[in-house]
Amino acid sequence: MKKFIVLIYGIIAYLVFLISFLYAMAFVGNFLVPKTINSATESTGISAVIINLLLLSLFAIQHSIMARPAFKAWWIKIIGKPAERSTYILLSSLALLLLFWKWQPINTVVWEIDNSLFVWIIIGVAALGWLIVLLST
């Protein structure tokens, strides 16, 4: 019974990951979702920058701490080895979904590429990055 519960937990964790992964692609790619990284309609100012930095920091800190061997060893004692990876995936995905939900788009161009060759290079590098993230799970 315990193995079955851990299996269901793992499936749920990976479904949440899949949702956050697909949403991340749309959020960063500026398509298909109601709020994207670039969807500001008015100037939002320094408060948006601070909120966004805090959201990014929360994700980065959670993601980095839980990946450390010392934390994993401690965490496995609490939840068990079979559920460790699923918990890491679930909490990282939830932190990312929180980032999307609370993100404050900024109505300022941070960078822009006009050369079509460089645009395609950036798109290719981005696609490779998404593929690496997907395959690393």
Model-identified regions with their sequence ranges:
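Membrane-anchoring alpha-helices and their flanking helix-loop junctions
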Residues: 1-137
